[in-house]
């Protein structure tokens, strides 16, 4: 299966926000057609990515289910590639917990995480002037080897098709429920992570 993913940016500013609110959002009689006719929601093309994933064998599942899982994996890879190439599209994820110089987050192979990837640790702040949420870098973290959550779409099928030793490792990684990052010994509970530098390759 091959997934082609296009990334668009919504053109937006305070003037558009105010006009849309007046014409549509705060108008009780407004309809979806009014939103379309307002011509306020415009998109700018940012980039494109492609990724492939093979259909695995599994006698316990239908071909439709297997094809669906392969499609999901291809889409996940394509989205992960877009995040690497376009900083504004990078997901900000909450830190799940901190302990002994490590931070943990519920992201993994589905999001394209690989060993050695570098992440920023961010603090959420309210800008007193704009009243908008901003994120300030307060630290760094690096993905630990063999501590990456195996949450890939159709993970059970991949495990079923792997050799015994590899399948055992994949199963162990699947049961982690988190990815482990090396950081300093500060308490980053309530903070966030965002990809800074990609070290590993997202395989097709």
Placement of each model-derived feature along the sequence:
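Surface-exposed, polar/charged interaction patches used for macromolecular assembly or partner binding
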Residues: 1-204
